[in-house]
C-alpha cells in the first residue's frame, strides 16, 4: 500500500517541473528576441543610414562632390553602428528591468 502512495505522490510532482520548464523557455525566448533585435539593428541600421544620408540628405540638399558625399555617408554609418553597439552593450551590462534571476534549487 505504501508503494501506491509513493507513486501517486510522485506523479503530482511533475506539474511544478513543467511550470518551471515553461518559465525557463519563456526566459530563453525573451533572450532570443532581444539578441535577434540587436543583431538586426547592428546589421541594418548602418546600411540604412548610409543610403539615407547618401541618397536623400547629402545629394539633394548639399552641393558637394560625390567622393565627399560617400565619405560623409560612411562616417554616418560608422556612427550609427557605434550607437547600436553601445545600446547592446548597455543592455547586456545593466540588463532589462525585472530581469534579475532568482536562484532555484
Swiss-Prot record:
<feature type="transmembrane region" description="Helical">
    <location>
        <begin position="69"/>
        <end position="89"/>
    </location>
</feature>
<comment type="function">
    <text>Required for the assembly of the V0 complex of the vacuolar ATPase (V-ATPase) in the endoplasmic reticulum.</text>
</comment>
<dbReference type="Pfam" id="PF09446">
    <property type="entry name" value="VMA21"/>
</dbReference>
<protein>
    <recommendedName>
        <fullName>Vacuolar ATPase assembly integral membrane protein VMA21 homolog</fullName>
    </recommendedName>
</protein>
<keyword id="KW-0812">Transmembrane</keyword>
<dbReference type="GO" id="GO:0012507">
    <property type="term" value="C:ER to Golgi transport vesicle membrane"/>
</dbReference>
<feature type="topological domain" description="Lumenal">
    <location>
        <begin position="58"/>
        <end position="68"/>
    </location>
</feature>
<dbReference type="GO" id="GO:0005789">
    <property type="term" value="C:endoplasmic reticulum membrane"/>
</dbReference>
<keyword id="KW-0256">Endoplasmic reticulum</keyword>
<feature type="topological domain" description="Cytoplasmic">
    <location>
        <begin position="90"/>
        <end position="105"/>
    </location>
</feature>
<keyword id="KW-0968">Cytoplasmic vesicle</keyword>
<keyword id="KW-0472">Membrane</keyword>
<dbReference type="InterPro" id="IPR019013">
    <property type="entry name" value="Vma21"/>
</dbReference>
<comment type="similarity">
    <text>Belongs to the VMA21 family.</text>
</comment>
<feature type="topological domain" description="Cytoplasmic">
    <location>
        <begin position="1"/>
        <end position="36"/>
    </location>
</feature>
<feature type="region of interest" description="Disordered">
    <location>
        <begin position="1"/>
        <end position="26"/>
    </location>
</feature>
<keyword id="KW-1133">Transmembrane helix</keyword>
<dbReference type="GO" id="GO:0070072">
    <property type="term" value="P:vacuolar proton-transporting V-type ATPase complex assembly"/>
</dbReference>
<dbReference type="GO" id="GO:0033116">
    <property type="term" value="C:endoplasmic reticulum-Golgi intermediate compartment membrane"/>
</dbReference>
<feature type="transmembrane region" description="Helical">
    <location>
        <begin position="37"/>
        <end position="57"/>
    </location>
</feature>
Amino acid at each position: 500500500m505504501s508503494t501506491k502512495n509513493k507513486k501517486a505522490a510522485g506523479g503530482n510532482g511533475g506539474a511544478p517541473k513543467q511550470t518551471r520548464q515553461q518559465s525557463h523557455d519563456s526566459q530563453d525566448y525573451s533572450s532570443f528576441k532581444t539578441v535577434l533585435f540587436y543583431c538586426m539593428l547592428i546589421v541594418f541600421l548602418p546600411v540604412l543610414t548610409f543610403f539615407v544620408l547618401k541618397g536623400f540628405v547629402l545629394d539633394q540638399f548639399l552641393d558637394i562632390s560625390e567622393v565627399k558625399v560617400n565619405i560623409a555617408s560612411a562616417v554616418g554609418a560608422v556612427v550609427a553602428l557605434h550607437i547600436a553597439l553601445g545600446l547592446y552593450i548597455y543592455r547586456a551590462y545593466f540588463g532589462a528591468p525585472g530581469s534579475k534571476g532568482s536562484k532555484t534549487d
